[in-house]
Amino acid sequence: MKLYEYIKFLGLKKPVNLRIVTRKNRFADAEYEAEYSDKTGKLKEHQITIFYKDNSRNLDTLIAHELIHAWQEENKKAETHGEYFKKYARKMEKEFNLTEIYIDGVDLE
């Protein structure tokens, strides 16, 4: 797993809390949630949960996918799997020799 390399590549500034759960989630293989401060309203950290059982993608690809959502949050790109997501998915696939960070028809807009 190249978690720190992915974070550095994306230029993430906020901490990433990665949780791996060894059970299946019927809705998604992974999920991203931004955590904001109650006092200041500013982004505090990124919460990523990987539900790692019988997945269609490998662990590195799932983590890269969710980290792109973290990048979107830090850079205020309010889209789910739009233009910016696809651009960074392609960049990460090329840089780290990953496949299917974004899957058309699976990753919904």
Descriptions of predicted regions:
Residues M1-T61, A70-E109:
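Active-site-proximal or metal-binding-adjacent scaffold patches in catalytic folds
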Residues E66:
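Walker B catalytic acidic pair
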